[in-house]
Amino acid sequence: MRAIISVALFLSLSLLSAVNAAEILSAGDTDDVIPDSYIVVMRDGLSTDAFNSHTTQISGFRNEDRNVKASLKKTFDLNGLKGYSGTFDEATIRQIANDPAVKYIEHDRIANARGLVEQQDAGWNLARISHKKTGARTYVYDKSAGAGISVCLVDTGVDVDNPDLGGRATWGANFVDNDDSDGNGHGTFLASLIAGQKHGVAKKAKIIAVKVLDANGSGSYSNVISGIDWCVKYAKEHGISERMVVNLSLGGGYSQAVNQAAENAVLAGMFVSAAVGGSNRDARNDSPASARGVCAIAASTMDDKAALFSNYGSIVAVYAPGQNIMAAGRMGSVTLSGTSFAAGHASGVGAYLLALEKITGDRVCTRIKELAIPVIRNSPSNTTRLLLYNGSGR
Protein backbone atom coordinates (compact mmCIF):
# COMPACT_ATOMS: atom_id res chain seq x y z
CA MET A 1 0.00 0.00 0.00
CA ARG A 2 2.87 2.35 0.85
CA ALA A 3 4.36 1.81 -2.63
CA ILE A 4 1.05 2.65 -4.28
CA ILE A 5 0.71 5.88 -2.30
CA SER A 6 4.33 6.79 -3.07
CA VAL A 7 3.91 6.34 -6.82
CA ALA A 8 0.57 8.14 -6.81
CA LEU A 9 2.11 11.10 -4.95
CA PHE A 10 5.00 11.21 -7.40
CA LEU A 11 2.63 11.26 -10.36
CA SER A 12 0.53 14.00 -8.76
CA LEU A 13 3.58 16.18 -8.21
CA SER A 14 4.66 15.46 -11.78
CA LEU A 15 1.38 16.67 -13.20
CA LEU A 16 1.46 19.84 -11.11
CA SER A 17 4.97 20.64 -12.31
CA ALA A 18 4.36 19.91 -16.01
CA VAL A 19 4.81 23.59 -16.83
CA ASN A 20 8.36 23.43 -15.46
CA ALA A 21 9.17 20.02 -16.93
CA ALA A 22 12.81 19.14 -17.41
CA GLU A 23 14.09 19.31 -20.96
CA ILE A 24 14.47 16.03 -22.82
CA LEU A 25 17.45 16.83 -25.01
CA SER A 26 17.16 16.03 -28.71
CA ALA A 27 18.94 12.87 -29.79
CA GLY A 28 20.15 14.45 -33.05
CA ASP A 29 21.92 11.75 -35.09
CA THR A 30 20.33 8.53 -33.81
CA ASP A 31 22.88 6.04 -35.15
CA ASP A 32 24.51 5.53 -31.75
CA VAL A 33 21.41 5.98 -29.56
CA ILE A 34 20.54 2.99 -27.37
CA PRO A 35 16.78 2.36 -27.82
CA ASP A 36 14.58 3.38 -24.85
CA SER A 37 17.64 4.16 -22.70
CA TYR A 38 18.11 7.50 -20.93
CA ILE A 39 20.41 9.43 -18.61
CA VAL A 40 18.49 11.51 -16.04
CA VAL A 41 20.39 14.40 -14.41
CA MET A 42 19.04 15.93 -11.19
CA ARG A 43 18.88 19.63 -10.30
CA ASP A 44 21.86 21.24 -8.58
CA GLY A 45 21.88 21.02 -4.80
CA LEU A 46 19.39 18.14 -4.54
CA SER A 47 19.88 16.41 -1.20
CA THR A 48 20.86 12.76 -0.96
CA ASP A 49 17.59 11.94 0.82
CA ALA A 50 15.54 13.59 -1.95
CA PHE A 51 17.55 11.77 -4.61
CA ASN A 52 17.10 8.41 -2.90
CA SER A 53 13.37 9.06 -2.54
CA HIS A 54 13.10 9.87 -6.25
CA THR A 55 14.95 6.74 -7.38
CA THR A 56 12.91 4.56 -5.02
CA GLN A 57 9.73 5.91 -6.59
CA ILE A 58 11.08 5.22 -10.08
CA SER A 59 11.88 1.64 -9.11
CA GLY A 60 8.29 1.26 -7.92
CA PHE A 61 6.77 2.02 -11.32
CA ARG A 62 7.45 -1.45 -12.66
CA ASN A 63 6.25 -3.13 -9.49
CA GLU A 64 2.83 -1.46 -9.72
CA ASP A 65 2.23 -1.91 -13.46
CA ARG A 66 3.88 -4.76 -15.37
CA ASN A 67 3.03 -3.02 -18.66
CA VAL A 68 5.26 -0.08 -17.74
CA LYS A 69 8.78 -0.25 -19.13
CA ALA A 70 10.87 1.19 -16.30
CA SER A 71 14.20 -0.23 -15.21
CA LEU A 72 16.67 1.89 -13.25
CA LYS A 73 20.17 0.59 -14.05
CA LYS A 74 22.87 2.83 -12.54
CA THR A 75 23.06 5.86 -10.24
CA PHE A 76 25.91 8.36 -10.06
CA ASP A 77 26.80 11.15 -7.64
CA LEU A 78 29.81 13.08 -8.87
CA ASN A 79 30.90 16.60 -8.04
CA GLY A 80 28.09 18.70 -9.50
CA LEU A 81 26.51 15.79 -11.38
CA LYS A 82 23.90 13.63 -9.70
CA GLY A 83 21.58 11.31 -11.60
CA TYR A 84 20.91 7.85 -12.95
CA SER A 85 20.44 5.83 -16.11
CA GLY A 86 17.81 3.32 -17.10
CA THR A 87 15.41 1.92 -19.65
CA PHE A 88 12.04 3.69 -19.82
CA ASP A 89 9.12 3.84 -22.22
CA GLU A 90 7.98 7.19 -23.61
CA ALA A 91 5.15 7.72 -21.12
CA THR A 92 7.39 7.01 -18.13
CA ILE A 93 10.20 9.30 -19.28
CA ARG A 94 7.68 12.14 -19.64
CA GLN A 95 6.50 11.54 -16.07
CA ILE A 96 10.10 11.62 -14.86
CA ALA A 97 10.71 14.88 -16.75
CA ASN A 98 7.78 16.47 -14.90
CA ASP A 99 9.40 15.96 -11.49
CA PRO A 100 10.83 19.32 -10.29
CA ALA A 101 13.89 17.47 -8.99
CA VAL A 102 15.00 16.63 -12.54
CA LYS A 103 17.24 19.09 -14.41
CA TYR A 104 17.40 17.45 -17.85
CA ILE A 105 17.22 14.10 -19.61
CA GLU A 106 19.22 12.83 -22.56
CA HIS A 107 19.33 9.63 -24.59
CA ASP A 108 21.96 7.09 -23.61
CA ARG A 109 24.37 6.31 -26.45
CA ILE A 110 27.06 3.88 -27.50
CA ALA A 111 30.54 5.14 -26.59
CA ASN A 112 33.31 4.48 -29.08
CA ALA A 113 36.23 4.68 -26.65
CA ARG A 114 37.26 1.21 -27.80
CA GLY A 115 37.64 2.60 -31.29
CA LEU A 116 36.51 1.53 -34.72
CA VAL A 117 38.33 -0.91 -36.93
CA GLU A 118 38.78 -0.05 -40.60
CA GLN A 119 39.41 -2.98 -42.94
CA GLN A 120 41.25 -1.76 -46.03
CA ASP A 121 40.83 -4.77 -48.32
CA ALA A 122 37.07 -5.10 -47.93
CA GLY A 123 34.65 -6.11 -50.66
CA TRP A 124 32.17 -3.55 -51.96
CA ASN A 125 29.42 -5.19 -49.93
CA LEU A 126 31.14 -4.72 -46.56
CA ALA A 127 32.07 -1.15 -47.45
CA ARG A 128 28.47 -0.43 -48.43
CA ILE A 129 26.87 -1.62 -45.20
CA SER A 130 29.26 0.51 -43.11
CA HIS A 131 28.91 3.80 -45.01
CA LYS A 132 25.89 5.98 -45.67
CA LYS A 133 27.05 6.84 -49.18
CA THR A 134 28.27 4.73 -52.08
CA GLY A 135 31.86 4.62 -53.24
CA ALA A 136 33.61 3.67 -50.00
CA ARG A 137 36.39 1.08 -50.14
CA THR A 138 36.81 0.18 -46.47
CA TYR A 139 34.73 -1.75 -43.96
CA VAL A 140 34.27 0.16 -40.70
CA TYR A 141 33.06 -1.65 -37.59
CA ASP A 142 33.37 -1.68 -33.82
CA LYS A 143 35.99 -4.15 -32.67
CA SER A 144 33.45 -6.02 -30.53
CA ALA A 145 32.61 -7.57 -33.93
CA GLY A 146 29.95 -10.00 -32.72
CA ALA A 147 32.04 -11.47 -29.90
CA GLY A 148 30.01 -13.79 -27.68
CA ILE A 149 27.27 -14.32 -30.27
CA SER A 150 26.54 -17.63 -32.01
CA VAL A 151 24.98 -17.97 -35.46
CA CYS A 152 23.03 -21.17 -36.09
CA LEU A 153 23.53 -21.64 -39.83
CA VAL A 154 20.75 -23.90 -41.15
CA ASP A 155 22.06 -24.80 -44.59
CA THR A 156 24.29 -27.24 -46.52
CA GLY A 157 26.79 -27.63 -43.71
CA VAL A 158 30.07 -25.78 -43.21
CA ASP A 159 33.72 -26.52 -43.84
CA VAL A 160 34.60 -25.74 -40.24
CA ASP A 161 38.33 -25.85 -41.02
CA ASN A 162 38.15 -23.11 -43.65
CA PRO A 163 40.91 -20.60 -42.79
CA ASP A 164 38.58 -17.59 -43.06
CA LEU A 165 36.53 -18.92 -40.13
CA GLY A 166 39.50 -18.80 -37.76
CA GLY A 167 38.49 -21.86 -35.75
CA ARG A 168 35.17 -20.30 -34.70
CA ALA A 169 32.94 -22.77 -36.58
CA THR A 170 31.68 -26.05 -35.13
CA TRP A 171 29.28 -28.77 -36.19
CA GLY A 172 25.92 -28.81 -34.51
CA ALA A 173 23.62 -31.31 -36.23
CA ASN A 174 23.13 -33.16 -39.51
CA PHE A 175 19.65 -34.06 -40.76
CA VAL A 176 20.73 -35.12 -44.26
CA ASP A 177 23.37 -37.85 -44.09
CA ASN A 178 26.31 -39.15 -42.08
CA ASP A 179 28.82 -36.85 -43.77
CA ASP A 180 29.63 -33.79 -41.68
CA SER A 181 30.95 -31.79 -44.59
CA ASP A 182 29.67 -29.16 -46.99
CA GLY A 183 29.36 -30.87 -50.35
CA ASN A 184 27.81 -27.80 -51.94
CA GLY A 185 29.73 -24.78 -50.65
CA HIS A 186 26.66 -22.62 -50.00
CA GLY A 187 26.87 -22.96 -46.23
CA THR A 188 30.62 -22.36 -46.11
CA PHE A 189 30.22 -19.24 -48.24
CA LEU A 190 27.56 -17.93 -45.85
CA ALA A 191 29.66 -18.74 -42.79
CA SER A 192 32.53 -16.76 -44.31
CA LEU A 193 30.22 -13.86 -45.17
CA ILE A 194 28.63 -13.77 -41.72
CA ALA A 195 31.71 -14.29 -39.55
CA GLY A 196 34.84 -14.68 -41.68
CA GLN A 197 38.09 -12.95 -40.74
CA LYS A 198 38.43 -11.40 -44.21
CA HIS A 199 35.00 -11.59 -45.80
CA GLY A 200 32.78 -11.49 -42.71
CA VAL A 201 30.47 -8.91 -41.17
CA ALA A 202 30.74 -10.07 -37.53
CA LYS A 203 34.35 -11.22 -37.43
CA LYS A 204 34.32 -12.59 -33.88
CA ALA A 205 30.96 -14.40 -33.94
CA LYS A 206 30.78 -18.18 -33.76
CA ILE A 207 29.16 -20.38 -36.42
CA ILE A 208 27.20 -23.53 -35.60
CA ALA A 209 26.63 -25.71 -38.68
CA VAL A 210 23.22 -27.37 -38.99
CA LYS A 211 22.97 -29.40 -42.18
CA VAL A 212 19.50 -29.66 -43.73
CA LEU A 213 20.37 -29.42 -47.44
CA ASP A 214 22.37 -31.91 -49.51
CA ALA A 215 25.27 -31.47 -51.94
CA ASN A 216 22.81 -30.26 -54.58
CA GLY A 217 21.57 -27.52 -52.26
CA SER A 218 18.15 -29.07 -51.71
CA GLY A 219 16.35 -30.78 -48.87
CA SER A 220 12.93 -31.41 -47.41
CA TYR A 221 10.90 -28.96 -45.37
CA SER A 222 10.86 -31.58 -42.63
CA ASN A 223 14.67 -31.31 -42.53
CA VAL A 224 14.42 -27.53 -42.27
CA ILE A 225 11.93 -27.79 -39.40
CA SER A 226 14.21 -30.27 -37.61
CA GLY A 227 17.17 -27.95 -38.09
CA ILE A 228 15.40 -24.90 -36.69
CA ASP A 229 14.05 -26.94 -33.79
CA TRP A 230 17.57 -28.15 -33.01
CA CYS A 231 18.82 -24.54 -32.86
CA VAL A 232 16.03 -23.58 -30.45
CA LYS A 233 16.68 -26.52 -28.13
CA TYR A 234 20.46 -26.12 -28.25
CA ALA A 235 20.25 -22.44 -27.37
CA LYS A 236 17.86 -23.13 -24.51
CA GLU A 237 20.03 -25.92 -23.10
CA HIS A 238 23.10 -23.69 -23.18
CA GLY A 239 21.35 -20.53 -21.97
CA ILE A 240 22.19 -18.52 -25.08
CA SER A 241 18.77 -17.96 -26.68
CA GLU A 242 19.15 -14.17 -26.56
CA ARG A 243 22.72 -14.40 -27.91
CA MET A 244 21.81 -16.63 -30.84
CA VAL A 245 21.14 -15.69 -34.47
CA VAL A 246 19.42 -18.15 -36.82
CA ASN A 247 20.26 -17.74 -40.51
CA LEU A 248 17.76 -19.17 -42.99
CA SER A 249 19.13 -18.60 -46.48
CA LEU A 250 16.77 -21.19 -47.91
CA GLY A 251 13.10 -21.71 -48.60
CA GLY A 252 10.41 -22.29 -51.15
CA GLY A 253 6.63 -22.16 -51.39
CA TYR A 254 4.49 -21.20 -48.42
CA SER A 255 4.47 -23.67 -45.52
CA GLN A 256 2.60 -23.07 -42.30
CA ALA A 257 4.72 -25.69 -40.54
CA VAL A 258 8.05 -24.13 -41.60
CA ASN A 259 6.78 -20.69 -40.65
CA GLN A 260 5.71 -21.95 -37.25
CA ALA A 261 9.17 -23.43 -36.67
CA ALA A 262 10.77 -20.08 -37.53
CA GLU A 263 8.29 -18.24 -35.32
CA ASN A 264 9.17 -20.57 -32.45
CA ALA A 265 12.80 -19.48 -32.76
CA VAL A 266 11.72 -15.83 -32.60
CA LEU A 267 9.53 -16.51 -29.56
CA ALA A 268 12.50 -18.23 -27.91
CA GLY A 269 14.34 -14.90 -28.03
CA MET A 270 16.48 -15.35 -31.13
CA PHE A 271 17.05 -13.03 -34.05
CA VAL A 272 16.06 -14.86 -37.24
CA SER A 273 17.18 -13.61 -40.66
CA ALA A 274 15.63 -15.17 -43.76
CA ALA A 275 16.18 -14.72 -47.48
CA VAL A 276 13.05 -13.61 -49.34
CA GLY A 277 13.87 -15.73 -52.40
CA GLY A 278 15.02 -15.04 -55.92
CA SER A 279 11.96 -15.53 -58.12
CA ASN A 280 11.05 -11.86 -58.65
CA ARG A 281 7.67 -12.26 -56.94
CA ASP A 282 5.89 -11.22 -53.76
CA ALA A 283 7.76 -12.76 -50.83
CA ARG A 284 4.62 -13.33 -48.77
CA ASN A 285 4.12 -16.52 -50.81
CA ASP A 286 7.43 -17.99 -49.62
CA SER A 287 8.57 -19.64 -46.40
CA PRO A 288 10.23 -19.10 -44.01
CA ALA A 289 10.63 -15.41 -44.95
CA SER A 290 6.89 -14.83 -44.48
CA ALA A 291 6.92 -16.08 -40.87
CA ARG A 292 5.89 -13.56 -38.22
CA GLY A 293 8.79 -11.93 -36.44
CA VAL A 294 11.36 -13.12 -38.96
CA CYS A 295 13.55 -10.42 -40.53
CA ALA A 296 12.94 -10.87 -44.27
CA ILE A 297 15.86 -9.65 -46.38
CA ALA A 298 15.85 -8.72 -50.08
CA ALA A 299 18.90 -8.34 -52.33
CA SER A 300 20.45 -5.10 -53.59
CA THR A 301 23.17 -4.30 -56.12
CA MET A 302 26.37 -2.26 -56.02
CA ASP A 303 24.52 0.81 -57.34
CA ASP A 304 21.79 0.68 -54.68
CA LYS A 305 19.12 -0.92 -56.82
CA ALA A 306 16.88 -3.84 -56.02
CA ALA A 307 18.39 -6.91 -57.67
CA LEU A 308 16.20 -7.96 -60.58
CA PHE A 309 15.96 -11.53 -59.29
CA SER A 310 14.99 -10.57 -55.75
CA ASN A 311 11.54 -11.19 -54.33
CA TYR A 312 9.83 -8.14 -52.86
CA GLY A 313 6.73 -6.99 -51.00
CA SER A 314 5.48 -5.55 -47.75
CA ILE A 315 7.17 -8.21 -45.62
CA VAL A 316 10.67 -7.08 -46.64
CA ALA A 317 12.46 -5.52 -43.65
CA VAL A 318 15.49 -4.17 -45.53
CA TYR A 319 17.59 -4.74 -48.61
CA ALA A 320 21.19 -5.91 -48.26
CA PRO A 321 23.99 -6.57 -50.77
CA GLY A 322 23.21 -9.71 -52.75
CA GLN A 323 24.90 -9.41 -56.13
CA ASN A 324 28.53 -10.19 -56.94
CA ILE A 325 29.45 -11.01 -53.36
CA MET A 326 32.85 -12.51 -52.57
CA ALA A 327 33.44 -14.94 -49.72
CA ALA A 328 35.15 -18.26 -49.02
CA GLY A 329 34.29 -21.31 -51.10
CA ARG A 330 35.48 -24.90 -51.00
CA MET A 331 38.47 -24.10 -53.23
CA GLY A 332 39.30 -20.52 -52.27
CA SER A 333 37.33 -17.29 -52.60
CA VAL A 334 34.37 -17.25 -54.99
CA THR A 335 31.83 -14.65 -56.13
CA LEU A 336 28.11 -15.44 -55.93
CA SER A 337 24.75 -13.67 -56.14
CA GLY A 338 21.43 -14.32 -54.41
CA THR A 339 19.08 -13.28 -51.64
CA SER A 340 20.77 -15.97 -49.53
CA PHE A 341 23.74 -13.67 -49.19
CA ALA A 342 21.62 -10.60 -48.48
CA ALA A 343 20.22 -12.53 -45.50
CA GLY A 344 23.77 -13.46 -44.51
CA HIS A 345 24.71 -9.78 -44.29
CA ALA A 346 21.70 -9.16 -42.04
CA SER A 347 22.63 -12.11 -39.81
CA GLY A 348 26.11 -10.64 -39.47
CA VAL A 349 24.80 -7.20 -38.58
CA GLY A 350 22.34 -8.84 -36.17
CA ALA A 351 25.19 -10.62 -34.37
CA TYR A 352 27.19 -7.37 -34.42
CA LEU A 353 24.37 -5.38 -32.79
CA LEU A 354 23.65 -8.08 -30.20
CA ALA A 355 27.27 -7.86 -29.06
CA LEU A 356 27.66 -4.09 -29.35
CA GLU A 357 24.36 -2.77 -28.02
CA LYS A 358 23.43 -5.64 -25.69
CA ILE A 359 19.87 -5.64 -27.04
CA THR A 360 17.57 -8.65 -27.04
CA GLY A 361 16.91 -10.78 -30.09
CA ASP A 362 13.36 -9.52 -30.50
CA ARG A 363 14.71 -5.97 -30.86
CA VAL A 364 17.31 -6.68 -33.54
CA CYS A 365 15.15 -6.49 -36.67
CA THR A 366 13.56 -3.26 -35.45
CA ARG A 367 17.02 -1.87 -34.70
CA ILE A 368 18.24 -2.88 -38.16
CA LYS A 369 15.34 -0.93 -39.69
CA GLU A 370 16.07 2.08 -37.46
CA LEU A 371 19.68 2.20 -38.62
CA ALA A 372 18.99 1.43 -42.30
CA ILE A 373 19.22 4.17 -44.93
CA PRO A 374 16.44 4.82 -47.51
CA VAL A 375 18.46 4.68 -50.72
CA ILE A 376 17.13 1.79 -52.83
CA ARG A 377 16.07 3.51 -56.04
CA ASN A 378 13.87 1.02 -57.85
CA SER A 379 12.05 -0.96 -55.18
CA PRO A 380 8.41 -1.82 -55.99
CA SER A 381 5.77 0.51 -54.59
CA ASN A 382 4.83 -1.87 -51.78
CA THR A 383 8.43 -2.54 -50.75
CA THR A 384 10.78 -0.65 -48.45
CA ARG A 385 13.66 1.48 -49.78
CA LEU A 386 15.81 0.75 -46.73
CA LEU A 387 19.36 -0.57 -47.14
CA LEU A 388 21.21 -2.40 -44.37
CA TYR A 389 23.68 -0.21 -42.42
CA ASN A 390 25.71 -1.13 -39.34
CA GLY A 391 25.57 2.33 -37.75
CA SER A 392 29.33 3.00 -37.91
CA GLY A 393 28.70 6.74 -38.22
CA ARG A 394 30.58 6.95 -41.53
Swiss-Prot record:
Propeptide positions: 22-114
One family name in Pfam for this protein: Peptidase_S8
Alphabetized UniProt keyword annotations: Glycoprotein, Hydrolase, Protease, Secreted, Serine protease, Signal, Virulence, Zymogen
UniProt KW Hydrolase keyword: yes
Keyword Lipid biosynthesis carried by entry: no
Location within or outside the cell: Secreted
Gene Ontology BP term (one): proteolysis
Predominant location category: secreted
Cited PROSITE patterns: SUBTILASE, SUBTILASE_ASP
Active site: 155, 186, 340
Main EC class the enzyme belongs to: hydrolase
Gene Ontology CC terms, in alphabetical order: extracellular region
Gene3D superfamilies membership: Peptidase S8 propeptide/proteinase inhibitor I9 (3.30.70.80), Peptidase S8/S53 domain (3.40.50.200)
Residues bearing glycans: 216, 247, 382, 390
Signal peptide boundaries: 1-21
MF terms (GO), sorted A to Z: serine-type endopeptidase activity
InterPro entries assigned: PCSK9_ProteinaseK-like, Peptidase_S8/S53_dom, Peptidase_S8/S53_dom_sf, Peptidase_S8_Asp-AS, Peptidase_S8_subtilisin-like, Peptidase_S8_subtilisin-rel, S8pro/Inhibitor_I9, S8pro/Inhibitor_I9_sf
EC number(s) reported in the record: 3.4.21.-
Positions of disulphide bridges: none
Ranges for domain Peptidase S8: 123-394
UniProt function note: Secreted subtilisin-like serine protease with keratinolytic activity that contributes to pathogenicity.
Protein name per UniProt: Subtilisin-like protease CPC735_005570
Native source species: Coccidioides posadasii (strain C735)
